[in-house]
Regions:
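Sec-dependent signal peptide recognition
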Residues: 2-8
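C-terminal motif of bacterial Sec signal peptides marking the signal peptidase cleavage site
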Residues: 15-16
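Mature catalytic domains of secreted/periplasmic carbohydrate-active enzymes
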Residues: 20-392, 397-398, 402-405, 410-419, ...
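Trp- and acidic/polar-enriched beta-sheet ligand-binding modules for extracellular glycan
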Residues: 21, 389-392, 415-484, 526-530, ...
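Glycan-recognition and processing domains
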Residues: 352-378, 490-518
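Short, well-ordered beta-strand elements within core beta-sheets of diverse protein domains
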Residues: 397-399, 531-534
Length: 624
């Protein structure tokens, strides 16, 4: 018996020695840093726009607004943070300094800051207050510091760079851990500039010396992710509507893209041939504007709209940074906070019951070892299924215990090894045959997370086919849900809400003129001579002008600087309003100009400049 035991022991040992060790798949470049992976896992966090603009009904301050107008009466950063926590958000980024140059902290570098406001008799520090609230409630804290400064006299010279670097160092050394530093791509243009009141142009790619800025951030806050059009930590999605494309690569061509990059549409999908990992961040506001405007109190995004944004951002391999404008009291308004929290509850409800939990699927190929099919449903981020090397197409088949209703799916790649999947399909078992699930979008990339919505099916089987991949696929999670029956939502209803006096367009063909009063935002009038004259039929009292730019996403000829003239002849000359439609290219929303009531028959709207080359573009015009 003793000899038999020894023989069996030796046989087992020899068997173990000869068993082939299964190696993990080789990473495929480009790869994320550990900080970028951690950032992706945050998924949603808040943006806070709060500044002088809040108290002066502005989006982009000119740089000359009086600091004494900044006076929130009931400011409570804990109210903000508790709202974000209740909405499942993991952090917040605040506009420490927007383009107007006003600073929300008592900086030692300029007088244009909170120190010279009535708030707390000049002893306030909103950056400090928010940082403390985040620490108290375990929320991550980030800062937005605009490179463009319309107040600073030396903007455009090397002296401004020293000022900007010093501001950045103040923020990164005095307020604890920073998870994200936000560098806006808007730069150069007209401004106050210490009283010069002029337009200044800079080389957006080289002026700021972004490598120097990155060095400062990495030295002082090594775990912070840097946002800009080009990253290097995360990138702008190319629009301010909060949407990523269904095809979304976490790559950019690093030598091509820079902050202020003009080909914004490329950022919505990334570069499939990119050599640098730069994950996408979708920025959008819960209201039409970024700063608080009382006129937008009835335009807060609904729970259904916010839910749709989640699927088109987080569900498209991007993070969602959702702006919550702070009102004049210093609080998040009730409707905004209610809709935000209910949106989170709605997502939690829709994705609550994973129908694939604990089911080990059948796969056409698996690598073996730790990289097997059961890793797809074990609820462990760091375990994953992978195929053998050079096997870039395969199937994953789930058999459910019984037929279930299904209308949502979640897929995740193990991104520490790179983003791989290029095309996949989903099918369901319909008795004796497999049928394709009818999607409303292409099934191409997956990345950190892909969420699929489709019409409800009844099935006891789901099959995912990886049709093409950059290397052997590595997936760490697949889930399926029944989210209940939901309705489609629309964001482009601005046109139908425009109320206006009747008018006739004089300087275009009648059929073309109808495009700007048909309450259809998708019909756009293009005018080469960059002005339009409207005939009200008779002299009437008017006090406001409404302009809806091209909202199709094509960024056609939006007016960014305008003049409005009135009179009783077809060539009116009395100027009643002129100014700027700030940020209109990135955020093409309805613009409303209010002016002192005046009687006139004719109204002339002229573009002093456009946000993009080409003819002047008008979707709708209203006169009240």
């Amino acid at each position: 018996m003793k000899h038999l035991f020894s023989f069996l022991t030796l046989a087992l040992l020899l068997s173990g020695c000869t068993q082939k060790e299964v190696k993990a798949p080789e990473p495929i470049s480009p790869l994320p840093t550990p900080q970028q992976v951690a950032w992706n896992k945050l998924e949603t966090y808040a943006f806070v726009h709060f500044s002088l603009n809040t108290f002066n009904d502005l989006e982009w301050g000119y740089g000359d607004t009086d600091p004494k107008t900044f006076n929130p009466t009931h400011l409570d950063c804990e109210q903000w943070v508790k709202t974000f926590k209740d909405a499942g958000m993991k952090g917040v980024v605040i506009t420490a300094k927007h383009h107007d140059g006003f600073c929300l902290w008592p900086t030692k570098l300029t007088e244009y800051c909170i120190r010279n406001t009535p708030y707390k008799d000049g002893k306030g520090d909103i950056i400090g207050e928010l940082s403390a609230a985040c620490k108290k409630y375990d929320l991550k804290f980030g800062v937005y510091l605009s490179p463009w400064d319309r107040n600073y006299a030396e903007y455009g010279t090397p002296a401004y760079l020293d000022y900007y670097y010093a501001q950045l160092k103040e923020l990164l050394t005095n307020y604890g851990d920073i998870f994200e530093v936000w560098l806006d791509g808007a730069n150069g243009g007209d401004g106050y500039y210490g009283g010069a009141r002029e337009k200044r142009s800079i080389d957006g790619k080289n002026y700021y010396n972004f490598p120097k800025i990155h060095q400062i951030v990495h030295e002082l806050q090594p775990n912070a992710v840097i946002f800009s059009d080009a990253g290097p930590g995360c990138r702008w999605i190319g629009n301010e509507r909060g949407f990523a494309n269904a095809t979304n690569w976490s790559f950019l061509r690093g030598n091509d893209v820079y902050p202020g990059y003009q080909k914004a549409d490329e950022l919505t999908s990334g570069h499939a041939d990119g050599d640098t990992w730069v994950g996408a961040e979708c920025d959008v506001s819960i209201r039409p504007g970024w700063f608080f405007h009382e006129s937008q109190n009835d335009q807060v995004k609904t729970v259904d709209q916010l839910t749709d944004l989640y699927y088109r951002s987080v569900g498209h391999n991007a993070n969602l940074i959702l702006n919550m404008p702070i009102n004049k009291e210093g609080l998040i308004s009730k409707t905004d906070s209610t809709n935000l929290v209910q949106f989170y509850q709605n997502i939690e409800k829709q994705l609550a019951d994973n129908l694939l939990k604990g089911i080990t699927p059948k796969v056409s190929n698996e690598r073996g070892g730790a990289y097997v099919a059961k890793a797809l449903t074990d609820d462990n981020y760091d375990t994953y299924w992978a195929t053998d090397d050079n096997v870039i197409n395969s199937t994953i088949t789930f058999k459910l215990p019984k037929a279930e209703q299904v209308n949502r799916m979640m897929l995740q790649e193990y991104i520490p090894l790179g983003q791989r999947v290029k095309v996949f399909t989903v099918e369901y078992n319909d008795g004796d045959k497999w049928l394709p699930v009818q999607m409303n979008e292409e099934t191409t990339t997956i990345g950190y997370k892909r969420l699929l919505r489709f019409k409800t099916i009844m099935t006891d089987g789901l099959r995912i086919t990886i049709n093409d991949s950059r290397a052997c696929p590595c997936l760490n999670n697949i889930e399926a849900f029944y989210a209940g029956e939901t309705t489609d939502v629309s964001f482009d209803n601005q046109a139908k809400d425009i109320q206006s006096l009747n008018y006739k367009v004089l300087n275009v063909e009648e059929t073309d003129g109808d495009k700007i009063k048909d309450k259809n935002g998708s019909t756009v009038l293009l005018i080469d001579n960059r002005y339009i004259t409207l005939d009200l039929g008779k002299s009437v009292a008017i006090n406001s002008f409404l302009y809806l730019p091209d909202i199709s996403g094509q960024h056609k000829g939006s007016v960014d600087h305008y003049t409005i003239q009135v009179g009783d002849s077809e060539n009116p000359t009395q100027t009643i309003a002129e100014g700027e439609f700030a940020n209109i290219k990135s955020n093409p929303i309805l613009q409303i100009v209010h002016f002192t009531p005046v009687k006139a028959r004719y109204v002339k709207f002229s573009a002093k400049s456009l946000a993009s080359e080409g003819p002047m573009a008008i979707a709708e015009i209203g006169i009240k």
